[in-house]
A protein has these predicted regions:
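Conserved acidic carboxylate
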Residues: 7
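Charged phosphotransfer/docking patches of two-component systems
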Residues: 10-17
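Acidic, metal-coordinating helix/loop segments flanking the phosphotransfer/catalytic sites
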Residues: 17, 32-55
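His-Asp phosphorelay/catalytic-motif detector in bacterial-type signaling
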Residues: 52-54, 79-83
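Active-site residues of response regulator receiver
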Residues: 58-60
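Alpha4 helix (beta4-alpha4-beta5 surface) of REC/receiver domains from two-component response regulators
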Residues: 66, 70, 90-93
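Short amphipathic alpha-helix used as the core "switch/output" element in two-component signaling
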Residues: 67-80
Length: 93
């Protein structure tokens, strides 16, 4: 299973990775590959090259012009078969 994290803050990148590794240990999934992207632009560049991921954790408030919501729309437009989980610390979402 390919899991991707699109998060611009290192602290939260690590927290999400730790949660995934804990889940992996509890469920005995040995075939997990985690990729971390610090910006939506980095992720879009790979998606444009037909890169695939099964599960994607996206921070809603990414630094830069493209938000996590924008990234999700792009993935939808590309008709990729990816499950998206939005992550945020903001109460308005």
């Amino acid at each position: 299973m390919r899991i991707s994290i699109c998060e611009d803050e290192l602290t939260y990148q690590i927290a999400i990775q730790n949660a995934i590794r804990h889940w992996q240990a509890v469920t005995h999934h040995d075939d997990i590959e985690i990729s971390v992207f610090p910006s939506s632009d980095d992720m879009i560049d790979l998606l444009d090259k037909n890169w695939e991921t099964d599960l994607l954790f996206i921070d809603i408030q990414l630094q830069g012009e493209t938000t996590g919501i924008d990234l999700a729309h792009k993935i939808h437009e590309m008709q990729l078969d990816t499950t998206i989980v939005f992550c945020t610390n903001y109460n308005q979402y």
